Structures are given as structure tokens and as C-alpha cells.
Amino acid sequence: MPFDGVDQETVNRLPRLSELHDAYGVQVNSISVDELFDLYERTGFLYPDKAARLLPHLGRVKENWRRMFDAGESLLYVFTAGDQREGRAALAVFRTTHRGWTYQHLVSEDNPFGSRSVMLAAGAAMILKGSDESAQNWFRPENRFPARVFGSMIEAIGGSLSSVQNYAYFSIPRTVALPSDQGIRVVPYDAAHNKDLCSLAELTRGRVFVTAEELATDVPLKSLDLLYRRVGLRRTRHVWLAYRQKWPVGAAIAYRGPLGLNFSFLENRCDLLLASDLTETEQQRVAAGLLGAAVTAYDTFELDFIPLVAGESAMPVLLNLGAQFVRHYCQCIWLKDGYPRSYRHVDSFYSKVLDRARKKTVQPSALLESVR
């Protein structure tokens, strides 16, 4: 839809795309993978528990990042700002669907000016390129910075163009024994199921989720996978639906991609969708059937567990099935028509951060907690 007057004014004030790097004082993909991971360690983003999970696979993870860099800016771009004296800031953005991107791993060496630069440059690039349809960010609700920026996105953009959903993140062993139930029919997705999948996803996750995840247009992510194949990687999606009689009551959406694009392995998560009118007993039957099918998508997965994301109401059921609760996560999504508003929202937030930093009423490091 066309921008309103305020949004158009925001767009008109942006630099040309060719001038973006100089205008914001940023560089794109100029940092090496080793330097970037060193920055993650220095800023505490790779804290001990997270580093311990990555360490056994660090060589593979770094190689995956290098291949993503080899694709230019078609799969991954890392904005950096600042220098050794001022402190560096970085933001990574990777292509999660054919026309959607995930903002992640915002870090700063006590340089709020650099953090502002990389965030606004990323937002401006999305607007100026004009080819992207959605952006998203995953954050832990207890992390103050992302909770204040991304957690308030609906207030800034509106519920028709953005969403913020709370989820529980689990690890479930790939070898877990799951009960089967003849009363629940689980089927692999094909095009004939698209209406059921989109309807269920809209009821459980919202219309913004359906749009951003491109469920109506490319469930297996075929177009995206072609881009990843160019650098010897894969990005696919596998779906199963659960039916009670003829009605869809659940779905498992298994994302597969290069290990470690996200340090919580969200690029390889399994999203579990359960109809809201199910009893706890029915939830367990449906979840068991879906997970029993979805585990086959992880036959070649490097980890011994599957990253599992579900609504918080499913926690008792999944614990009963052998899943281990890891943490709470929020997924913030904003759509293309909301980009100018999200840009103003981030700009306004950082104006306050910088004002406080200048006055030294609080330390910038307290305001710039990394998105973990």
C-alpha cells in the first residue's frame, strides 16, 4: 500500500542507496568471520554457556558464515561501525525467506553511536532496496534493550504490519520415543493442504506471521534454497499437519539451514503449532504425532537435539514428552509497509539513548545489552 505523508517524508530524507554507507558511517561485510566472532566474545555476546554449545561445531559454523559472505549481500550482510579507539558495533542480517530477513547479533563495545548507525543503516537499506517484504528479530524478554526496541514495535507500527509473539524454546532429543495415537492423523504437507496450513498458522501465530514466513507462496522455500545452493549450502522447510477427523489441529514446521547462523540454532528450529481449543490431553496426542514425523527432517542434523519452539501454553505437554525447556523467546516481525515507521521508532529510541549517554546519567553499556 502507498505510504502516508509522514512515511513518505521519512523515505524522502534517506540518502541514495549508493551513498548509504558513507551517510551512516558503516561498512558492510568488511569484517572477517574470525574478527566478527572475536568481537562477539569481547562484548560478552558469546557468553560461556552459549560458547560451550557452539564450541564442538565452531569450525563448521564459521565455514557456514564464510560461505554466506561469499554470496555477497544476497544471503548475509554484517553492518559494522566504529573502530578500535571508539569501540566497534555490529549487526548481522541473514535471509530467512526469499523476501524476508532476520536481524540478529547486535553487539557494541560501549559505542551507542555505532549501534545507532548499524541499526538505522539496516533499516534504510531495507526501504531503499524495495524488494524485501519482511524483517524479524528474536530476543529474550529479559534482555532490556531488545525488549524495549522490538517489544514495542506494535505500538510504533500497528498490529496489521507487525507482531510480537512470546514462545517457549526447548531442546528435544532426536532419539526421543514418542507415543502414537490412531485418533490423530498426521500427513506430510503438499499443495492441497495450503489453505489448512495458512488458516491454522493465522489462528495460532497471526496474519503477519503467515505473510512474513511466506506460507501462502513457498512452503518448502524452493526459491530461497536456490540462492543458498550457489555457495554450497541448503535452506529448506518441511511441514506436517495433524488432523482430527477432517479439521487441522496442529502443524510442525521444520526449518533446515546452515548450522549456527543463529547461535541458538533458530535457523534449524521446529515450530510447533497447536490449535487453541485442544485440551491438554489432545495437545499431547497431537504434539507427539507431529514431532514423531518431524524428527525425520533432522536425520542429518549435526546436533543430538532439535531446537523446538512452541506457544507457552504447550510447556506442560512438551515437558511430559521429554523436551527440555531452555528459555523464553519473543519473535518480532514487521512488514514492508511498516519499514518507515520502524525506522523512526529505532531513531527515536536511539536519540534518547544518545542523549542520556552524553549527559552521562547512565552508562551506555547498561543500555546496549546485546541481543542474545
Please annotate each region the language model reported.
Residues 89, 94-161, 259-326:
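Acyl-donor binding region in acyl/amide transferases
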Residues 13-63, 179-219:
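Short amphipathic alpha-helix that is part of the acyltransferase structural core
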Residues 11, 35-39, 125-142, 146-147, ...:
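Compact beta-rich and alpha/beta scaffold cores in large eukaryotic transport/transcription complexes
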Residues 156-174, 326-338:
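Conserved catalytic-core motifs of GNAT/GCN5-like acyltransferases
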